[in-house]
Amino acid sequence: TVSENVVKKVEDVMPIATGHEREXLXAQ
């Protein structure tokens, strides 16, 4: 899905922030 692609790009750019990003996506 689009959200999965966004998360992958975020992981590539800022791997440290992925944990918070996933929590935010999961909350939504």
From Swiss-Prot:
This protein's GO CC annotations: mitochondrial inner membrane
Keyword Mitochondrion belongs to the record: yes
Subcellular location: Mitochondrion inner membrane
Source domain of life: Eukaryota
Pathway field: Energy metabolism; oxidative phosphorylation
Membrane-topology descriptor: Peripheral membrane protein
Protein's GO biological process: oxidative phosphorylation
This protein's UniProt keywords: Membrane, Mitochondrion, Mitochondrion inner membrane
Keyword rRNA processing included in the entry's annotation: no
Quaternary context: Component of the cytochrome c oxidase (complex IV, CIV), a multisubunit enzyme composed of a catalytic core of 3 subunits and several supernumerary subunits. The complex exists as a monomer or a dimer and forms supercomplexes (SCs) in the inner mitochondrial membrane with ubiquinol-cytochrome c oxidoreductase (cytochrome b-c1 complex, complex III, CIII).
Family indicated by similarity: Belongs to the cytochrome c oxidase subunit 5B family.
Function statement: Component of the cytochrome c oxidase, the last enzyme in the mitochondrial electron transport chain which drives oxidative phosphorylation. The respiratory chain contains 3 multisubunit complexes succinate dehydrogenase (complex II, CII), ubiquinol-cytochrome c oxidoreductase (cytochrome b-c1 complex, complex III, CIII) and cytochrome c oxidase (complex IV, CIV), that cooperate to transfer electrons derived from NADH and succinate to molecular oxygen, creating an electrochemical gradient over the inner membrane that drives transmembrane transport and the ATP synthase.
Name of the protein in its database record: Cytochrome c oxidase subunit 5B, mitochondrial
Source organism of this protein record: Solanum tuberosum
Lineage start: Eukaryota, Viridiplantae, Streptophyta, Embryophyta, Tracheophyta
